[in-house]
Regions:
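Predominantly extracellular/luminal regions of secreted and cell-surface proteins
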Residues: 126-136, 307-335
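Short coil/turn motif common to extracellular beta-sandwich-like domains
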Residues: 38-43, 173-175, 353, 363-367
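Edge strands and adjacent loops of beta-rich recognition modules
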Residues: 154-159, 320-360
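Accessory beta-strand-rich segments of carbohydrate-active enzymes
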Residues: 46, 85-86, 90-92, 103-108, ...
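Recognizes extended acidic, P/S/T-rich segments that occur
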Residues: 55-104, 114-120, 136-144
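Bacterial N-terminal signal peptides
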Residues: 6-16
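Pro/Thr/Ser/Gly-rich low-complexity, intrinsically disordered linker/stalk tracts
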Residues: 20-52, 127-132
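Short, solvent-exposed loop/edge segments of extracellular or virion-exposed proteins
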Residues: 26-33, 140-151
Length: 373
């Protein structure tokens, strides 16, 4: 009896030890479930979680599948690493089948340690972006000149560009993905809903070398009739004090847009809604000027109404133009975007003539939100 009790105690002890070790925080290129990466052999990482001390990994096993269902069945149809004797848990290079552009991949891992093996981790995933120039159907569009009301003197002014396109979806949608490069900054809307939670996108670069694009899954937003809307700001692409003396600040051209919306249907067919000269454009919106140095001028009398939704009357808008191609290489943004992290109230508000000065109490970058009665 004592032997039986001891045997069961050992089993329970081994079971508790087994459950006490796991792997968490699965990352691809050090990003958590990234969308639209343009790396053909991404690097995978995880962290060991354990109640025990001195746990050392001795081997790993990675599965990558084309669907969550296959991964749940333990089938790595894209890559099955097998058991690899290694203590590496960071920057493990993918060694499976050639990855396709604009495709989702699902993965999980398990490890052996000096104190037991783990169960399979929770599912993680990444999606690929567009690897080559040939993968982009979208043209660079915009308005490659100043509009009425713009000024390109020492104190430059350039109104935001507003672009829109309506399209229909007639079949059942399996997946819909947007790849967008909006220089210098953009906000993207589909059927009236703003896409993504990052701001001041994309991240700034040396535009002579690199232009970044972002990727979003918009499957749940598509209807039978749809509208895409994009606001283009200047960012650091069209530099607002480019003729500010005694220093010359580089500028890289007028705001411009390139976009692919790839719709994959349940019957296996695909369709791409891409930027071209069929898109409509106006500069007669409420954002009359915008730049990092001098802020934003917003004229609410020029608000455009429901321009990001279907059925909008854009007959007075111009056709978008094909514009000059940026010199930088188009690449996926492989870092987290900037986000709103805090909302602050002013510590004081002072009136100076017909202006109001808000003291936020600290140095910051952001926007003002207010109501007018």
């Amino acid at each position: 009896n004592k032997r039986i009790v001891s045997f069961f105690f050992l089993l329970l002890f081994a079971g508790s030890l087994y459950a006490a070790i796991g792997i968490i925080d699965l990352r691809t290129e050090q990003l958590k479930n990234p969308a639209g990466i343009d790396v053909r052999q991404p690097r995978l990482s995880w962290r060991i979680e354990s109640d025990e001390q001195n746990v050392i990994q001795t081997a790993y096993h990675i599965l990558v599948a084309s669907s969550p269902e296959l991964l749940e069945q333990g089938k790595g149809d894209i890559w099955d690493s097998g058991k690899i004797e290694s203590d590496a848990s960071q920057w493990i290079t993918y060694q499976g089948k050639t990855l396709k552009c604009n495709a989702p991949y699902y993965w999980k891992a398990k490890i052996d340690t000096n104190k037991g093996a783990t169960n399979w981790s929770a599912l993680a995933f990444w999606t690929t972006g567009l690897f080559n120039e040939a993968d982009w159907q979208g043209q660079w569009i915009g308005l490659d000149r100043a509009a009425p009301g713009d000024s390109e003197t020492q104190w430059s002014r350039l109104a935001a560009r507003y672009l829109r396109k309506e399209f229909a979806v007639k079949k059942s949608v399996k997946r819909a993905t947007v790849h967008i490069a909006g220089m210098g900054l953009y906000e993207l809307f589909i059927n009236g809903q703003r896409i993504g939670n990052q701001v001041l996108a994309p991240a700034p670069t040396d535009y002579r070398k690199t232009i970044l694009y972002n990727t979003y899954d918009v499957t749940s937003l598509l209807q039978t009739e749809n509208a895409i809307g994009v606001t283009l700001g200047n960012g650091r692409f069209y530099t607002m004090r480019q003729n500010y003396k005694p220093y010359k600040i580089p500028t890289f051209g007028y705001p411009k847009l390139r976009l692919n919306l790839i719709v994959e249907y349940a019957d296996g067919s695909k369709e791409t809604i891409a930027t071209n000269t069929s898109w409509k454009l106006t500069t007669e919106g409420p954002i009359r000027s915008n730049n990092e140095y001098d802020g934003e001028e917003y004229d609410a009398r020029k608000e455009l109404g429901a321009w990001t939704q279907t059925g909008y009357d854009d007959k007075d808008w111009m056709q978008a133009q094909r514009v000059s191609i940026p010199s930088g290489t188009l690449r996926a943004q492989m870092m987290p975007g900037m986000k709103v992290t805090e909302t602050l109230k002013p510590v004081s508000i002072k009136k100076l003539g017909n202006k109001y000065i808000l003291d936020i109490g600290q140095n910051m970058a952001g926007w003002v939100r207010f109501r007018i009665k």
